[in-house]
């Protein structure tokens, strides 16, 4: 079986190792292999830091810049 594709029953049991979310359009994995939701995975890929938990909402959210990045 190809490990890149998780069956539906396994996907339902996944919990994001960063925000503890259980609902996402796509599951990703950290370098250590732990599952992360799409939002946390993309935030880390872009900012190289874990996504702050206060950003987690039950509804859609805006992506905030990483700490230390100023607006012009």
Curated annotation (Swiss-Prot):
Pfam family, one: GATA
This protein's GO CC annotations: nucleus
SUPFAM superfamilies: Glucocorticoid receptor-like (DNA-binding domain)
GO BP, one annotated term: positive regulation of transcription by RNA polymerase II
Keyword field contains Zinc: yes
Record-linked InterPro entries: Transcription_factor_GATA (IPR039355), Znf_GATA (IPR000679), Znf_NHR/GATA (IPR013088)
Keywords: Metal-binding, Nucleus, Transcription, Transcription regulation, Zinc, Zinc-finger
Primary subcellular site in the record, as a coarse category: nucleus
Gene Ontology MF terms: DNA-binding transcription factor activity; double-stranded DNA binding; sequence-specific DNA binding; zinc ion binding
Disruption phenotype: No phenotype detected and so may be dispensable. RNAi-mediated knockdown causes intestinal expression of heme transporter hrg-1 induced by heme to be reduced drastically in L3 stage larvae. Reduces expression of the daf-16 isoforms d and f.
UniProt keyword Zinc-finger present: yes
Role noted for this protein: Probable transcription factor. Plays a role in regulating heme-dependent expression of heme transporter hrg-1. Modulates lifespan in a daf-16-dependent manner.
Name of the protein in question: Probable transcription factor elt-4
UniProt source species: Caenorhabditis elegans
Native organism taxonomy: Eukaryota, Metazoa, Ecdysozoa, Nematoda, Chromadorea
């Amino acid at each position: 079986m190809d490990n890149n594709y998780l069956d539906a029953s396994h996907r339902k049991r996944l919990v994001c190792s960063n925000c503890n979310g259980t609902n996402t359009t796509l599951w990703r994995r950290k370098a250590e292999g732990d599952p992360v939701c799409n939002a946390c995975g993309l935030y880390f890929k872009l900012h190289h830091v874990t996504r702050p938990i206060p950003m987690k909402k039950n509804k859609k959210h805006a992506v905030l810049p990483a700490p230390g990045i100023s607006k012009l």
